[in-house]
Amino acid sequence: MANGILVIDKSAGWTSQDVAAKLRGVFHERRVGHGGTLDPMATGVLPIFIGRATRAAEFLESAEKEYIAGLRLGTVTDTQDTSGTVLETHPVTVTRADVQAALQRFLGPIEQIPPMYSAIKIGGQKLYELARQGKEVERKPRSITIHELELLEGEGTEYVLRVRCSKGTYVRTLCHDLGSALSCGGCMSSLRRTRAGSFTLSQAVTMQQVLDFAAEHDPQELLMPVDAVFSVHPPLIVTLGQAAKLKNGAQVRDWQFRPGTYRVYAEDGEFLLLGRVENGLLTTIKSFFEVNTLAT
């Protein structure tokens, strides 16, 4: 049975669900999910969670992401990117210095109105379904954080940005809003995710590489262990006796434990759970041990 994480370098044209569906067949495993949707036109880091590792996907969805984005000024579209229908065009007279100055206005905590072409549900319907019917509904602004926003290159109408942001950020909306701030309109012309949580492009493989490898080898050799998603947290080793208690749902008290969030391992190396220590008491946030290893 396959269990682990595979970081895919998604190609343009694939939906995130397309990738997950294809890998269900490769690994013969029904439980396959991803850690944060990438639009079809976007490329780059798409962490895939397989088998028991799907229990960890929610933790990556909430992690910060990093992107390289193309900004096209002077063009406004219904999808806020170049895949959509052009609604407006405007002359562009801004300079690189103007763009650089505008970026500063979007740094830090900001409010962002989600685009109509998104999977957010309002009244039980996804926004993109309403948008395809020609309907537009009021969306409430969402609080996001732009940690870094760097102008890498560009002039005239085409610019390249590096964006490090919180969960829930729509980079195409950021491009649209930048265009509005510059009074010429704008949209996203390209998007490449370079990091999701602790996962980077250096760890990623393409779907074709996966398929080629699986044709001659066991594809499970490509998988990273589930605890890789928690690498930002320090490890905590517990005795086999303490591990048995944790597996049976109990808390474990040890005054040598320091406060914090930990990757918890049994002393034999088995990854047990993500846990939190307060006042010497270790409690489970999410468990990942195999059910057939439960202590009796």
Q: Which role fits each region the language model picked out?
A:
Residues M1-D9, Q17-A42, A97, A181-T296:
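Accessory RNA 3′-end/elbow-binding domains used by RNA modification enzymes
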Residues M1-K167, V171-A204:
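Catalytic cores of RNA-modifying enzymes
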